[in-house]
A protein has these predicted regions:
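Hydrophobic beta-strand anchors of alpha/beta hydrolase catalytic cores
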Residues: 47-48, 80, 116
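N-terminal targeting signals for export/organelle localization
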Residues: 1-25, 159
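Thiol-based oxidoreductase modules, predominantly thioredoxin-like and allied folds used
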Residues: 28, 74-99
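Conserved redox-active cysteine motifs that mediate thiol-disulfide chemistry
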Residues: 50-64
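Conserved helix-turn-beta segment immediately C-terminal to the redox Cys motif
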Residues: 41-44, 63-86
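Non-catalytic, surface beta->alpha helical segment in thiol-disulfide oxidoreductase systems
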Residues: 106-153
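A short beta-strand-turn-helix
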Residues: 26-45
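Short pre-active-site segment immediately N-terminal to redox-active cysteine/selenocysteine motifs
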Residues: 43-46, 51-54, 112
Length: 159
């Protein structure tokens, strides 16, 4: 699968910046097995947003794009979940096993934040990952395209 990169607008691991307070965030991934079951039943994609607290680009992506999309244009058409790259936050994986956010990030080879990966109910990637904030003018379009790719891959009708 082709990877889309914009390292100039992404935060690599170990970058020390002062933590910022999140003014916007998605629901944290806590039970991907339940999300996966809903995805399979409803034939809707799951958008996994990988971030770290010390990432100003993540804050902007959440505030300006992802949170509004999850509440408006994609409400009921996709499941949006946030995954912390750096912390072992407990989560139930797609197969029902207990794991952690940082382990999920490692499995998808996420090294930079923000990273967006659209998956199906089994956790399989359905579109090319979006790494970094990319060109701000087109970021919303990149997200829409990744979600539309997911919808097509799942054979879901557009709602």
């Amino acid at each position: 699968m082709r990877r889309v990169h914009a390292q100039a607008l992404s935060t690599p691991p170990g970058t020390s910046r002062a933590p910022i307070a999140r003014s916007a965030q998605l629901e944290a991934a806590s039970d991907l097995a339940a999300d996966g079951a809903m995805s399979a039943r409803e034939r809707i994609p799951i958008l996994l947003f990988f971030d770290r607290l010390e990432c100003p680009y993540c804050e902007r992506a959440l505030r300006e794009y992802l949170v509004p999309m999850s509440r408006e244009a994609w409400r009921g058409r996709a499941i949006f979940r946030q995954v912390d790259i750096d912390r072992p936050v407990p989560v139930v994986d797609f197969d029902g096993t207990r794991t952690s956010h940082d382990t999920i990030a490692a499995r998808y080879r996420v090294r930079f934040s923000p990273t967006v990966i659209v998956v199906g109910g089994d956790g399989r990637e359905l579109s090319a990952p979006i790494v970094g904030l990319l060109t701000v003018d087109f970021y919303g379009a990149y997200l829409d395209r990744a979600l539309e790719d997911g919808v097509r891959a799942l054979g879901a009708r557009r709602l």
